[in-house]
């Protein structure tokens, strides 16, 4: 069970291909916790402005985990593909975001709230 609904599959159809890719690339397959996924989810949104779904954040969470464990090669380029748009699974952003500020329909007031004036 995981919050990452797109990868919440008991018996994935492409498991054999995933293992073949892992072996062929001399990579690894590991797991991350929901807490690690949500931390990566928030990080990529805050630092890069990218709105991903939790399933896409799982790869980033894995990279962060490997860095913390000092298991990343220093002489290699690492790529994490994030293909799942955050609009696929908006419940987690709604649950984890702060309450929105409600302002009147007024351009000057809106600009002030977001720090433009």
What are these regions (language model features)?
Residues 1, 61-117:
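Phosphate-binding loop/pocket of nucleotide- and phosphate-handling active sites
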Residues 7, 11-13, 36, 56-58, ...:
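Glycine-rich beta-alpha junction loops
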Residues 38-45, 49-65, 76-78:
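Substrate-binding/catalytic subdomain of NAD(P)-dependent oxidoreductase enzymes
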Residues 1-51, 95-117:
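Active-site/ligand-binding loops adjacent to catalytic centers
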């Amino acid at each position: 069970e995981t919050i990452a609904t797109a990868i919440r599959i008991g018996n994935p159809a492409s498991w054999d291909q995933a293992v073949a890719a892992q072996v062929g690339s001399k990579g690894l397959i590991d797991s991350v916790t929901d807490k690690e996924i949500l931390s990566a989810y928030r990080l990529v949104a805050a630092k890069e402005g990218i709105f991903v779904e939790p399933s896409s954040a799982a790869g980033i969470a894995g990279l962060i985990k490997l860095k913390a464990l000092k298991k990343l090669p220093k002489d290699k380029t690492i790529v994490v593909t994030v293909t799942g748009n955050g609009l696929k699974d908006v419940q987690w952003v709604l649950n984890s975001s702060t309450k929105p500020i409600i302002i009147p329909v007024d351009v000057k007031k809106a600009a002030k709230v977001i720090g433009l004036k």
